A protein has these predicted regions:
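Iron-sulfur cluster-binding electron-transfer modules in prokaryotic oxidoreductases
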Residues: 1-322
Length: 322
């Protein structure tokens, strides 16, 4: 709350409105840009239970919980809002899981293992309290997804009881695009929207996007085809030279103590993105978004960075407004 109140004193919105930049030269931030700070977090903007379908009228009604992640909750709030638009179109009810804690990734990557242990235990206990009432837990963040789906059980390797509890939860936990592509009819819905567009007498060409594969999504979880398949129903994919090359974010230590290295890696990726001449750069990761938005800004490349859920929700809302 204090961040949202005082941020305008130090920062101003970038031209595209998706990030903020310092009004003055500050030693720590070194003129880089960041995701804006929402006045109200995503989790505090809605009731915990969001019903798009009356479950009393239909026994087939599905419900998913949303693990939004810290950056999605406070900085990139529209990711969660977009997921709600999609779930409404799918007639799937949502639980915002307001008792969720940080997944523990920042503490894990900086060696604060006591905090990691506490956060995992708190989250596992909380997930267990509602897991039977939902069909899935969706995570629209690659880093959180990898931490929960892979690192939690490895961290708790010696605590067999807790590791077993984690493994019982995992079958219901998905990266958001993986669940939406494989477990729903979203592809069909988006394809129908596109087919109706093609029937119009005057058709504008498909907007183009290039996709950056977050390390945690593709290299750890194997999620890379699903977001592309969803987006390609309504957008034209222009692959960059190496979509799997790391963006350079590298975690808290790299962003503070080794920022010159992060900038060097980010600059290479920004050049790849610019060469595609795509209208959007897309990735299912807010850490990549923060890093590459800054890299593009420093290179004076005006290509907006969006989450795949934002582009999908954009199509759904445009279709609803016709």
């Amino acid at each position: 709350k204090l961040g949202a109140i005082f941020a305008p004193l130090l920062y101003q919105a970038t031209k595209d409105g998706n990030s903020i930049q310092p009004r003055f030269t500050l030693p720590l931030v070194k003129n880089r840009i960041f995701g804006g700070i929402a006045k109200r977090s995503f989790l505090n903007s809605h009731s915990e239970e969001i019903c798009f379908v009356d479950s009393k009228q239909s026994q087939k009604t599905r419900k998913v919980a949303i693990f939004i992640g810290c950056l999605g909750n406070y900085n990139y709030k529209n990711v969660g809002e977009s997921l709600l638009v999609i779930l409404e179109a799918l007639q799937i009810n949502a639980k915002l899981a307001k008792g969720q804690k940080c997944c523990g990734a920042p503490a894990y990557f900086t060696g604060d293992f006591a905090s990691v242990d506490t956060l995992i235990r708190q989250n596992v206990e909380y997930f267990e309290s509602f897991i039977e009432e939902v069909d899935a837990i969706l995570i629209p963040e690659a880093t959180c997804g990898a931490m929960i789906l892979e690192d939690w059980k490895h961290f708790m390797e010696k605590d067999l009881e807790l590791k077993s509890r984690i493994e019982k939860l995992l079958p219901k936990i998905y990266m958001a695009t993986k669940y939406l592509e494989s477990q729903t009819n979203l592809v069909e819905i988006l394809n129908n929207i596109e087919q109706n567009r093609l029937k119009q007498e005057f058709q504008s060409p498909k907007q183009t996007f290039t996709y950056h594969d977050p390390c945690h999504a593709r290299k750890v979880l194997g999620v890379y085809q699903e977001p592309r398949k969803l987006l390609q129903q309504n957008y034209q994919l222009v692959e960059m030279e190496d979509s799997t090359a790391c963006c350079g974010f590298g975690g808290v230590t790299i962003q503070t103590e080794r920022f010159a290295l992060a900038s060097k890696v980010g600059s290479k990726k920004a050049k790849m993105i610019e060469k595609t001449q795509a209208q959007f750069i897309v990735a299912e990761c807010s850490a990549c978004r923060m890093q590459l938005s800054n890299a593009l800004y420093q290179a004076n490349v005006e290509i907006p960075f969006l989450h795949p859920l934002e582009l999908i929700a954009k199509i759904i809302k445009e279709n609803q407004n016709k």
